[in-house]
UniProtKB/Swiss-Prot annotation:
Taxonomic classification: Bacteria, Bacillati, Bacillota, Bacilli, Bacillales
Quaternary assembly: Part of the 30S ribosomal subunit. Forms a tight complex with proteins S10 and S14.
Protein name, as recorded: Small ribosomal subunit protein uS3
Organism: Exiguobacterium sp. (strain ATCC BAA-1283 / AT1b)
Spans traversing the lipid bilayer: none
InterPro entries the UniProt entry points to: KH_dom (IPR004087), KH_dom-like_a/b (IPR015946), KH_dom_type_2 (IPR004044), KH_sf_prok-type (IPR009019), Ribosomal_S3_C_sf (IPR036419), Ribosomal_uS3_bac-typ (IPR005704), Ribosomal_uS3_C (IPR001351), Ribosomal_uS3_CS (IPR018280)
Keyword match Glycoprotein: no
Family, per entry: Belongs to the universal ribosomal protein uS3 family.
GO cellular component: cytosolic small ribosomal subunit
Any one Pfam family match given in the protein's UniProt record, by short name: KH_2
Domain (KH type-2) ranges: 38-107
GO process terms (BP): translation
Keyword line: Ribonucleoprotein, Ribosomal protein, RNA-binding, rRNA-binding
A molecular function GO annotation: structural constituent of ribosome
Length: 219
């Protein structure tokens, strides 16, 4: 099961938190769709800003968005112009609710699966050999101190007539262990031969239960 399912979804509520945090009764579907549209808009508008995660929290008439990015300067823009434009557009999507955007800097892009996958995809678009792109990314990520990494590319690799998948890994990536902190990210490379899918799994080590959590469980 661990090999097939999205590692983040499998661990939500165990060691990972939800990316959308709010409660609704009647208009649950509308708010869920709103979240989806907001994320899609941010992903398209901030394509080159290395956005790794978008967290959304809602209160009565307010939407708080946390943007995790490796390039905060690009998200904020000159004098805050970019982030203000982003806020205005999201306000329209959110039916006039008050929108607050918080930019969180990602210190090390090589230790975030989504950004590693995007980096490999950009290299593939620049006609770099897929083996070279994967091996270089693996080396850079392992230098950050992670316990293991697994990468996979699928599609017409090197312009081949028949699509295939290739995997490279280093260290350990225990997908079945629920307490294992595994970061998972995907990206797509648009090449002249078609799309190439990129998947990356990073293993950061085990999340051990704290004393407080253990006491709560005992109660």
């Amino acid at each position: 099961m661990g090999q097939k399912v999205n590692p983040h979804g499998l661990r939500v509520g165990v060691i990972k938190d939800w990316d959308s945090r709010w409660y609704a009764e009647k208009d649950y579907a509308d708010l869920l769709h709103e979240d989806f549209v907001i994320r899609e808009y941010i992903e398209n508008k901030m394509k080159d800003a290395s956005v790794s995660k978008v967290e959304i929290e809602r209160a009565a008439n307010r939407v708080n968005i946390s943007l995790h990015t490796a390039k905060p300067g690009m998200v904020i823009g000159k004098g805050g112009s970019e982030i203000e434009s982003l806020r205005k557009h999201i306000t329209k999507i959110a039916d006039g609710k008050r929108v607050h955007i918080n930019v969180v800097e990602v210190k090390n892009a090589d230790a975030v699966a989504k950004l590693v996958a995007e980096n490999i995809a950009r290299q593939l678009e620049g006609r770099v050999s897929f083996r070279r792109a994967m091996k270089q990314s693996i080396q850079r990520s392992m230098r950050t101190g992670i316990k293991g990494i697994k990468t996979e590319v699928s599609g017409r690799l090197g312009g081949a007539d028949i699509a295939r998948s290739e995997k490279y890994s280093e260290g350990t990536v225990p997908l079945h262990t629920l307490r294992a902190d595994i970061d998972y990210g995907t990206a797509e490379a648009d090449t002249t031969y078609g799309k190439i899918g990129v998947k990356v799994w990073l293993y950061h080590g085990e999340v051990l239960p704290t004393k407080n959590n253990t006491a709560k469980n005992a109660e």
